[in-house]
Curated annotation (Swiss-Prot):
It is an enzyme of class 2 (transferase). This is DNA polymerase alpha catalytic subunit. Belongs to the DNA polymerase type-B family. It comes from Leishmania donovani. InterPro entries: DNA-dir_DNA_pol_B, DNA-dir_DNA_pol_B_CS, DNA-dir_DNA_pol_B_exonuc, DNA-dir_DNA_pol_B_multi_dom, DNA/RNA_pol_sf, DNA_pol_B_thumb, DNA_pol_palm_dom_sf, POLBc_alpha. Zn(2+) 2 binds at residues 1233, 1243, 1271, 1286. One of its GO terms (molecular function) is single-stranded DNA binding. Residues 79-89 have a biased composition (Polar residues).
Amino acid sequence: MSGGNDGASWRLSRKPNAPNFDETQEDQWRSLREEVLQSDEDENIPESGDLTIPQLPSAKKAAKKLRKPPSGAKPTPKPKQQTLAQSMSDMDMERLLKRYRIDEDIDIAEDIDMSHLLQLHSDSDDGGDAQEATLTADEFLARLARAEAAPAASIAKEKRESGENVTVVALKDELFNVERDQSAKPPRPRPTPGAGGGAGYRNEETPKQAIELTATLAPQMDAAQFVSPAVPYKSGEMTEGLFYWFDAREQPHTLSVDPGSLFLFGKMAVEKNGRTSYLSCCVRVRNMYRSVFVLPKAGSSQEDVVKEINDICRNQGIEQRRIKFVERYYAFEVPGVPHEKTQWAKLRYPGRYPPLNAKGPFRHILIIMGASSSLLELFLIKRKLKGPSFLRISGLVASANRISHCALEFSVESPKNLRAEDTKLPVPPFTLASIQIHTQLDSKGACNEILIASVAIYKDVNIENTIRYIPDNILTGVRPASMSTPLPIDLESYCSAKGLPGVRRFANERALLDWLAQQLGKIDADMMIGHNFLGFTLDILLRRYQELSISSWSTIGRLDLKRLPRFQGTATNVNQEKETCIGRLVVDSYSLSREHYKTVNYRLLSLADQMQLQGITKGSNNFEPGTSVLTPAMLSASRDIYDVLLQVCNCAVLSTAVVSHLDVIRLTKRLTTIAGNLWSRTLFGARSERIEYLLLHTFHDLKFITPDRYVQNFKRGRDDEEEEDGKRKAKYQGGMVLDPKCGLYSDYILLLDFNSLYPSLIQEFNICFTTVDRESGSEIDVPPPENLICASCAAAGLSAPCLHKCVLPKVIKSLVDSRREVKRLMKIEKDANNLALLEIRQKALKLTANSMYGCLGFEYSRFHAQPLAELVTRQGRLALQSTVDLIPQLNPSLRVIYGDTDSVMIQTGIKNDIKAVRDLGLDLKAKINKRYQSLEIDIDGVFRAILLLKKKKYAALTVTDWQGEGKTYKKEVKGLDMVRRDWCPLSKCVCDSVLSRVLNAEGSEDILDYVMNYMRDVSEKVRAGRYTLDNFVISKSLTKEPEAYRGNSFPHATVALRMKQRKELVRVGDLIPYVICTGDRLSDKAFHVEEVRQNSQLQIDSEWYLSVQIYPPVMRLCEHIQGFSNAQLSEAMGIACHTGAKLEEEEAETMNDFSHSSLFQSRNLEECFPAALSLQVACTHCRLMTPINPHTRVMEVLADQERQRDRFDLYVCVSCRKSLPVDYVANCFTQTCYGIIRQFYQCGSAAAVKAVRTQFTYYRALFDVPHAPGCPARVKDAHYYQARRCLGVDRRLYTLAEAADPAVQEVADPVDPLNAAAETIYKRIDHLFINLDSLFAGI
């Protein structure tokens, strides 16, 4: 056969020279057809060439073998058999040829291989029956459709090898002409497998370079050579010092040692031999005081207030206290508190006493504020300490009883002994330690054990500069994986000779961890670096310390703690674990990269590849620290262990390299300096806390009483009360997103963007706690001019805005002005290091200003003020809408095609003149900005072409040099499938190629031709296995433990479970790579990449990838291109048109098909709702899970005549056959519904809407009247009179008939708990459903 042009189909006709069959040949074909009917095997199919078959017996000999019918029986008339040629129509032959046309390049004169239909029928020697059977053309083609590819060996060859004497006949008489029919399109070709063979992918192994060390490390073997020993100072030797602090901790009042004191950690300057050096130091600050503000009720005298305060203090055991009356301002969310200057009572008492109980009611006190403020917060605010800095400390007293691991330890009697140093001094050098451990599950698979620990040491690091990532030394400890396989004796000497000093081998894990704890104490690092240190490394270390009773475990921090945090099973208290690191700043490269670096894979080695970081090695092997499993055999030879240790050490170095690349140490330090919080908290990512401290410092300086830490609880209480009255308002509306004018635009698109929209709006309209009235009850609006000055300042004749008003706009203005000044300095700065510092400063200022609005809308922020947040977003919507309306007024030829929150896209209609586009943008900018004072719009970019698909989903060619010639372009993708990690690399590559052509094409015809040809080529290559395995890998993140996933629709969870069975480390948050192979269910088809590589029997499911991974994103990219249709694309790819097409759209369209006829077509609910989860509860007796299905229960009872006389219980355990309480089942059902709703709101897609609607429709039918139309009357009666049980307030069960009795209703008011629960759930989510009452009305 040969190929032809697209659009043609094939029509078959017999060649003129084909000879006719004689009678013997017809008999042979008849027998062959019987064989085809009886055989299900097609293994002996020749691949090509002449078909050879054994010579069949003649018709006469075959007839002799037939048994004679019994005497007296009339022979059954034998129907006339059709010949093969007669039984196959032209259409049948056409289908046959389509099925076996290999590709378009086969010559049309080739013979058709039909050997799979010709198999020898071997009759038994005793003369068995040889019944004749007819085979229609449809049956023939049905069997033909099940045939697979032919093997290379022929039947004749197999027969010869078996030793049988066979006669070979060449069937060259069945030849057909192939004529082209131009009216139809060709079928999809069936490509031959490529280099990948049967696996479905190309097996292309990248040669791996042997791993080797590239850095020179110091030869030290012990950390003691890196640190200064503790310096013992006698009392009186050092009374004043210069102290650089960077961390602090409050001593709880419940402890017996210095309760209510503070510990400051940092570096103390020490003079030695005329040189100043810095040693680690802990300063204990005693005699801290708490401050509480009390607002008297109107009409209460000061004496009454003082007396009541004294009574409260005496009741709580506060014996020492001071009370005085002061004037303060308040401007926040507690109702009833005056917002003008008011007289408050200030209570001060020692920090060793507990916080004051601020709960009322009180007789003369309206409210108590500040009781929840911590001593550490009061210290930072009152001493005006903003970030790490130098302190001049007087009255130092050397500590006799040391409680820290620092070289120096002092105490001071009062916080007033500390003051900020006025002279600007260089930051002291820091010591850094980067920690990397390798763990794997123990033999029982119960817990992680540590096999290798490596610490990279960095001495005398200037944190104001870029951090070097090559360490001064690396210390590494390793233990055997099995006690029966000790480590080689020459391991240390071998590693040292190879350039890796500092390696120590240990007999067991306890010796390894004891050594590690001691080394951390000797190193005395100021900063500890690690990848996922907080989420994994720290937790494992502390658990193993506890399990193995390591006495020096507290060297992980600088406080000599005696008690480890409490661990509850596998649960982790992250805050308690962080407390163990107090005094050492923790820099987690994983969490910081997630905050400051946008990618889809945050594994350390992946980040290093993306950032092009080298580390201290080159080359690679199959071992990845923290993921791979080490076997005793891998730790038996020094050479193999050396390779493993080198990888672990390299990961410790790469963590530092990632931190250095992101420059997060300098950035977080600058953010802390701006906000005035703790540096350690900024490193932990406490973004809202930074804004809280910035506002706390500001409002404290202005004599404002700030909100309590948990003021939102009070607010939520108000909301709960309003909800009961039905008056609770919905959450406020966010930014405006215009409906996009979807399509492909090839002219220039101008992008205008408001600079820092929300901070600018706060400045523009003076939106602040102090100016906006939230107490009047009316809708809040922009504050009028009279709200910009307080009464006291107005009485003093001061101008507006006064010092006590517009605090929030002033803070933002200060940040914006500072950033503008820094950017001005950046333009004239020449030194690279200074320029980097300025870049850090401006970035920190920008992040802080942009986060200011977030504290208003964040529910758990101390300064949460939803009315203000709503006012800001409302003004943002108005500003965007007015800009959209203004643009066509300024230039009627312009068209706004999209807008989102703070930006608009404008179609200019200009094709090739970038200067005209630039001038147009500058003109629009000037005219729009005339309308505002602080709000400013600017040109954010120019697009050469854009493909606009949906809201927040587009791809464009950005003109990077739009201010110049406009010849440089960069592709920008927002929100499309190709930027998500749950699409395989092949899908992303295909989409990228299609997108590049779409954005660069001249017309739609050119695009469609390319897309169809390209997708046809991709489909052929996928089926032929010409792509490598890495192209098919899908990665999904574990959001919970693999065991917690329910159902079979989570392939990554299935793969993760198998990884855990192989003792591989699997954690929540890990990306699980998997490949879909051939199989039935999706979860059964998913395999880890390494499983596929190691098992040649696993084959890539090419059809699944084409229809699920490639077709949908390409279809979405092209759906708005003129002339495109789904049928074109599916035909080019050779898949069914509906397969994978518009998955979300189709699900959304079918979502409303919840008619009674479409759902309830069976009496079995599981058949009506195959996708719904059945309801199962734990039996209260045997604790086994049992299904709940009342309708099935009734049907079972009615089917058994004997059981109808027994006591009937509707809910019975299927295992122990004991009855289940109705209210217990109702409670379990309610909890199940709430869990489904939680999962739905975490997803929220169209598919999730359909799923949750299906699930709750199933539940509604489960506990309602019989659901099937035509359900027997006796079943309905059983449901009504017996099965439908109602629970009364007297805890007695009633039937429906009894519940309908008015006398019973008056006494018991019975209700059906389960049906009531189903209806309650429906009311909560009725916006997702149709009217279900009408759905069940006709039953």
